Regions:
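Beta-strand-turn-beta hairpins that frame and shape the catalytic cleft
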Residues: 1-7, 125-131, 192-197
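Active-site-proximal segments of metal-dependent phosphoesterases and phosphodiesterases across multiple
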Residues: 4, 82-89, 130-170
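Core catalytic region of metal-dependent phosphoesterases/phosphodiesterases
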Residues: 5-9, 14-107
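Active-site neighborhood of phospho(di)ester-bond hydrolases with catalytic His/Asp-centered motifs
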Residues: 8-10, 34-39, 63-68, 132-133, ...
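Active-site environment of divalent metal-dependent phosphoester hydrolases
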Residues: 13-18, 42-47, 69-76, 125, ...
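Glycine-rich phosphate-binding loop signature in dinucleotide/nucleotide-binding domains
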Residues: 26-30, 126-127, 169-171, 213
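Metallo-beta-lactamase
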Residues: 92-129
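Binuclear metal-dependent phosphoesterase catalytic core
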Residues: 187-234
Length: 234
C-alpha cells in the first residue's frame, strides 16, 4: 500500500520569500497534500505586497485556511467584525495599537484577493481523521496547548473541552495547526477515549522557514520536521 503524505506550513505572515522557500522544498518531496494552516498575511501590514502572497498560493496546489491575523483583515468593516474583535479581546494579553491601522492594512488587499481569502474554509478535514485549524479547533486566536500553566493563560478548561468534543464529533484524531511552533507536537485524549495527536508546523526566523511532513503507514502517522533556507529577494 502506498503511504499517504501531507506537508504542513503555517504563519509565513506575508513573507513571500519564506513561503517560496517552503513550497519549493515541499514540492521536491511530492506530498499528496500541501496544507497552509493560516496567518497567510500579517496584520495589519505584511512585509511584502499581499497580492504577491495570494498570487503564489493561488498558483500552487495548496489547501489554505485563514489564521487570526487574516481574520482581522477579512472581517474589518463587515458584520462579522464585532465577533472577531471579541474573540481577540478574550485573550489575556493586550491587543496593542493595531486596531488603529486595520482599515489601512485591508485597503492594501485587492478586492479579488479579499474575495479569495474569504472563500477559504475556516477549518477542514484534509483526509480521513486529520483536522486542519490555525490555533485550536474552533478558535484561531488561541492554541490547543497542553495542560500547563505556561500554556494555559488564554485557554479555559471549557474552551479545551469544547475543542476536544468537536474533534470527536468529526472523527479527527490528528490535528495539524500553527499559531505557535512550540511544542511541535503533543498527545492528548478525546472524550470518547481515543488518542489525539497534535502537530504544528515548525518555526520561521530570518534565515529559514520550517515545515512538517506527515506520512501515514499502516494507519499510523509519522512526522518529520524540516527547514528551508530563505533566499533574500532581489
Amino acid at each position: 500500500m502506498t503511504a499517504e503524505r501531507i506537508a504542513l506550513i503555517s504563519d509565513c505572515e506575508g513573507n513571500v520569500a519564506a513561503l517560496q522557500a517552503a513550497l519549493r522544498a515541499i514540492k521536491r518531496l511530492a506530498p499528496d497534500s500541501i496544507v497552509v494552516a493560516g496567518d497567510i498575511l500579517a496584520s495589519p501590514f505584511s512585509p511584502d505586497p499581499p497580492s504577491e502572497t495570494i498570487a503564489l498560493l493561488r498558483s500552487e496546489p495548496v489547501q489554505a485556511i485563514p489564521g487570526n491575523t487574516d481574520r482581522c483583515l477579512l472581517d474589518w468593516g463587515t458584520p462579522r467584525w464585532p465577533h472577531t474583535l471579541w474573540m481577540r479581546l478574550r485573550r489575556s494579553d493586550p491587543a496593542g495599537s493595531w486596531l488603529d491601522d486595520m482599515a489601512g492594512g485591508q485597503a492594501l488587499i485587492a478586492p479579488a484577493d479579499l474575495a479569495w481569502l474569504r472563500s477559504l474554509a475556516e477549518e477542514f478535514l484534509v483526509t480521513e481523521g486529520v483536522w486542519v485549524c490555525h490555533g485550536m479547533p474552533g478558535n484561531p486566536w488561541n492554541s490547543i496547548w497542553p495542560r500547563s500553566p505556561i500554556y494555559d493563560a488564554n485557554v479555559s478548561a471549557a474552551d479545551r473541552d469544547a475543542s476536544l468534543r468537536m474533534l470527536a464529533n468529526v472523527d479527527a484524531t490528528l490535528v495539524l495547526c500553527g499559531h505557535i511552533s512550540s511544542p511541535p507536537e503533543y498527545h492528548d485524549q478525546l472524550p470518547d477515549g481515543r488518542d489525539l495527536h497534535v502537530v504544528r508546523a515548525d518555526a520561521r526566523d530570518a534565515e529559514s522557514v520550517g515545515y512538517a511532513v506527515l506520512t501515514r503507514r499502516s494507519d499510523t502517522w509519522h512526522t518529520d520536521w524540516h527547514s528551508a533556507r530563505i533566499v533574500a529577494r532581489a
